Amino acid sequence: RKNVEWNGHHFSSLVLDGGHNADALEALALQLEDWQFTNTTVILGMSGDKLQPVLIPMLEKIFRSCALLIACPFDSQRSVKPKELLRFLHVEIGSEKLPKTRTVRGAEEALGLAAESKENPLVVCGSFYLAGEVMQLLSD
């Protein structure tokens, strides 16, 4: 979606993607490349059982256009803690290849942080749960 308003904030472009496996993340990476997004803010939340090295090449492609990566939990016991998610990414990808990173306590805080970079496209990905929470916040 383009020109999304939330809580007095404006996002120029917003992509909600529930993909959480290699094929889905590859499709997202290709789509972001096709749209020529730059300086993207990515809100990423994942289930602990999905933290697999096989996802790294796809995540690296997504992060190429990323200026800020926000690690965000979602309301499920399966959600990986944000610091654990970033630790996994730092080990598997390397700190030098990651964009600027932040952790938050939930989707509302993540949207607030993303709103500070309002001209940047926003991509929410990694979990249907997280995408659903963001959709709910945007519809309130």
List PLM regions with ranges.
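Active-site-adjacent beta-strand anchor residues
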Residues: 18, 45, 104, 124-125
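C-terminal helical cap/extension that packs against the catalytic core
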Residues: 11-14, 56-121
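Short amphipathic alpha-helical segments
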Residues: 27-29, 55-57, 82-84, 135-138
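A glycine-rich beta-strand to alpha-helix segment
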Residues: 110-139
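Short active-site-adjacent structural elements
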Residues: 24, 51-52, 78-80, 111-113, ...
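Cofactor-binding loop segments of dinucleotide-utilizing enzymes, especially the Rossmann-like FAD-
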Residues: 44-48, 73-74, 126
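Nucleotide phosphate-binding/pyrophosphate-handling subdomain across enzymes
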Residues: 1-68
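Active-site catalytic pocket residues across diverse enzymes, especially alpha/beta-hydrolases
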Residues: 32, 89, 93, 138
